[in-house]
């Protein structure tokens, strides 16, 4: 496992935003730009201390969310694309802008975007579970009362859906699953919310038990997901699952100092490097890109290298790398 840089991130980024998809290793301009990618890219730019890139992504978010309705996609010629609005994307923008604010990156501009264009929609956004988790992560950094309120809402959803064999707030494990325990863990870590910490840890242990039970890491795939009483999908594994699982385990380690969480986080990072069902790395060291995921044979590792993958990987890498090097 090596530490990669921002070469592919820079390749995908222009003065307008970050291109959403590639065809092989070339930008697929037919797919344009997406708001959620810009939000995740902002997280990464802040973590990498790249104010030049952060400025691009903040600008994209600003032009997308300060109009009605929110623009979730743009075409290659930089025109709004009439595609469905995403509550998750807007909530991810809140999280990313909060991270920028907490790191003194264009603080006044980011606060203005939140106050004028996202804060008025928070009570609408919180009705979606993952959107609520993204909001919780952002609020944990800049709005303690809101963070505690959102955490209590997540906890109530968890309690309502809880089963002894399924300690999870939904009956199915879907997309970006680890963001749910991560949100609770961060509220517990930053604000001393004991129930949030304990429940987040319980949920994370459940998820780790599913994904890390074999010699290689098996993420919940999108070719069927994993519903209670069924079996986890083995294919359609996506980098965002591994990356967010790194973040959740780093947070759990910060709270408990239990080395098992650091080991688990390292294994999720190693999924990118070959601790997966193919035994092969999905990272291209030459251009510092990350493949779109792992599909069923004979397709296997995707040949495409879109934005979501590289921004999620880099953010997770930078969160856990100092801890791994310190313990090596």
Regions found by a protein language model. Name each.
Residues 1-328:
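Glycan-recognition and catalytic cores of secretory/periplasmic carbohydrate-active enzymes
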